[in-house]
Amino acid sequence: MKDIVSKVIRGFHFLRCYGVKDFFVRLREKGEEQGITYDEWKKLHSLTEKQLQEQKKAAESWVNKPFFRVVIEKELEEEISPATLKSLENQTYDQWSIEENEQAAMILFLKNGDVLAEHALYTIACLSDEKDLIYYDDDKITDVNNEPVPFFKPDYNLDLLRTENYFGTSFVVKCEFIEKAGLQEKLCNITGKNRIYEEIQNRIQKAAEREIQLYELILCCIEHTERIGHISDILVHHMENKNMDPIYWDYYLQRQCELVEQHLQRMGEKAKVTVENQLQACSVQYYVTEHERVSIIIPNKDEIEVLQKCLDGIKKTNYDNCEIIIVENNSCKDTFSFYHRIAPEEEMVHGVQTFQGKLSHNIDIKVVVWENEFNYSKLNNFGVQFATGKYYIFLNNDVEMIGTDWILRLSGDCHRNKVGVAGVKLYYPDDTVQHAGIVIGIGGSKRGIAANMFQGLPREEHGYQNRASLQAENGRR
């Protein structure tokens, strides 16, 4: 019964926000949604023998054939896995060697035991002229039934990469780029002797350090190039350690935070990096040293109690330089009485009726009257005309605040170079996710080109690959 009530509440919320037409489109989409198993997916995406042979013929005709040096992570005394070698020998593209080679144009990293898809090197080689760093999807055997679990990765996402190494332990980097960027030492840390690695006595920590060195190389690479490619195809199969020791994660996450902090310092970013043990990831909180003025714009029609809860939440913020602009739209007289109480100074500004006052000692409040019919975009744009802040927060009147640092978090992100918009995770009243980011092209939505992620997910759950709980760039598939 509780689940039904929650769905009804979310349905009414969707209807209120998007209107009748989109509500029924969403209802139809929900009825059509269905998933497929990984086995079914593989059947749909597997190459035929004919296609594999065509790749071999095509590669033979290439004038420029990039050569791969394959670096296999293993213990010194450990033999190379026959499965890994066989997968290399079965490639439709045969320009590779596990030995150091002066002709190598690309370096491919593998863990001992990894199995490459037959078309892996060919697919990567096709992209090699355009990209300096290439990663791809993979799967891992992680459960008791030895069933592989796929990891479908997003396109290059800087914020997500700073929380976890979603590129993984198998990726490709161009040799020429390594030299130009001056990263030979970082590469030698992986392929040769490494002081930190040699000093570690614990076997499990050594394994973690090997993977950390790969992550460090990735972070250093992205500081020097934006030519980063993602191949949306599963090109490598990993044999995962099913009983990963806690010692591994304690060491790995500590080192990861250190590397991310160093990376952020090199990039001139101000942030606090902490460990998220539950997510086995890092949390990066960007901050500003100066609290520049923030204007919070809230369209409103009646709903005094709802608006009051929203204002009470804003009042608790620990940000000390902000203003609230309520854009009034055709409310009744009782609502105007409420406006007079919270903003008693009434005046006409450029022909617009306004009310001004103080919500608290550090928060100014202003009500501006929009007398035309409801249009959400026009209401917000109208409110901006009266804003004095450097940053704008566009807020619905039914939003209640959970914490006190949300403006600090948003302004910290917006202050960064190349960031124009920042958003927050929203919950419905029943503690399910309203949205945890927006993605372009998801599900082929009939309502537009983008959709909310993880709608309806219980608050205590983290979603696919923890994406509902990790900071990431919106719009990335």
Write out the residue ranges for each language-model feature:
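Non-catalytic membrane-proximal stalk/linker segments that position and tether the catalytic domains
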Residues: 2-68, 73, 79, 84, ...
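Short, acidic, metal-binding catalytic loop of nucleotide-sugar glycosyltransferases
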Residues: 59-65, 85-95, 312-321
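A conserved acidic beta->alpha catalytic loop
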Residues: 76-78, 113, 328-338, 372, ...
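Glycine-rich, basic loop-to-helix element that forms the pyrophosphate-binding segment
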Residues: 101-103, 370-387
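Short aromatic/hydrophobic "clamp" motif used to bind/position activated sugar donors
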Residues: 107, 392
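Conserved donor NDP-sugar-binding/catalytic core segment of glycosyltransferases
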Residues: 118-149, 176, 226-227, 399-446
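A recurrent flexible, glycine/aromatic-enriched loop bordering the glycosyltransferase active site
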Residues: 148-177, 377-378, 441-477
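A short, conserved alpha-helix in the catalytic core of glycosyltransferases
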Residues: 177, 188-233, 260, 406-411, ...
